[in-house]
Amino acid sequence: MGHFNWIQYLTQIEHHYAHVVTAVAVTAFIFVLGIYARVQLGSGEVAVVPAGKFSVRGFFAMVTEGIYTLADQVIGHDGARYVPLAASIFTFVLINNLIGLFPGMTPATDNLNTSFAIGMFSFIYYNYIGLKYEGFNYLKHFLGPVWWLAWLILPIELISHAFRPLTLGLRLAGNITADHTVVGVFHQLFPIGLPVPFYAMGLIVSLIQAFVFALLTLVYVMLAKAHDH
């Protein structure tokens, strides 16, 4: 990306590391928000009382409830154990996406290195879950149900799985780059008034992309666990 970024004023950091700085800053920001939300949550009866207005605690509660419902629908009865993973991915991707709506800020998720890294994390995790719950049987499913077709099914399955983190990363980086480029162009041409609908579109795209990434991660976990049924 060749547009202006406030990080370029940090002379100790080369421009091609801007996405790393943004990702680290977002991670630290989410960590601080999480601690603050935990303090807001309190304990005992206070902890189960819903927040009366929009707050940091309310945001995390909304995300957790939404991801819990999604995990229950996708994975089933034990979907709750994967809520922390999916909610963390959703929050990290969402906040990174939203940062790009601020002038002079470049989201880490429009860089393929970052989005591919998140995809690789999902890839490693769901394969770990498959091996944890099925052991050697998880590897056997790559051969297909018919042994004499294993020579054909194995490369297809391996290629399909190998492309999952890449497609996750490309989808996220491509959509965020395109959306924020459109917002940036219209903001430069018409700095007042007209860019507002495009900012709204950017907000929607940011939400959808974070949701899709979390959803596909849960789907891959479900598929990895499905072979023992």
Please annotate each region the language model reported.
Residues 1-229:
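Selective transmembrane helix interface/packing segments
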